[in-house]
Amino acid sequence: RVDGDHIQLDLEPPRMQTVSGKCPPFYFGGLSPAARDVAAQDADVFLMWPDTMDKVSDILDDMRQRASGYDRTLKFGYRAHVIVRETEEQARAAADTLISKLDDGVGEEIRNRSLDSASYGVRRQAEMRDAANAAGSGDYVEENLWTGVGRARSGCGAAIVGDPDQVLAKLNAYRELGIEAFILSGYPHQDECDLFGKYVLPKIDHGALEI
């Protein structure tokens, strides 16, 4: 039974189950305390947007503790954009070009009209942009994590930017923290997918790929 402010819904029999119930894995994300508890109690994979390594580690620790309170174990996923080129200089130039014609006022309007503009997660993405700007680091909140893409959109607001080895190292650092699933994208999507497949995917130990 879902009994919310705007939606009242009965599902008989309930059809949402975790993967243990022989259905696809249930991915769930959210940084609010309520969202974290929902994920800890019911999700198979807790999915998060980009953040600094220290913050990601803190979130994973918190979610493990919450899940243990329900005698459960969570898996973790990471959603980010990627800009990879043969050299770091080329990757950074591609990132700069991506937003080179953006009017900051238009970017702010895009973010503010999004339905999730007041969410905990979106506020955290904004905090990272502000921190990068305050540091004068060219929108990089930490090594190879670029928040510039978030100036033109809501939601997932950072990209892993670098040469193939740097991008791989960043992904491996997340894996060492305990992240198992990655949802990656870029602009234009097909072009960045091809570049990731060319430069990074061959360096990753992975199973069979299907399209």
Give the residues covered by each predicted segment.
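A local structural motif
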Residues: 21-25
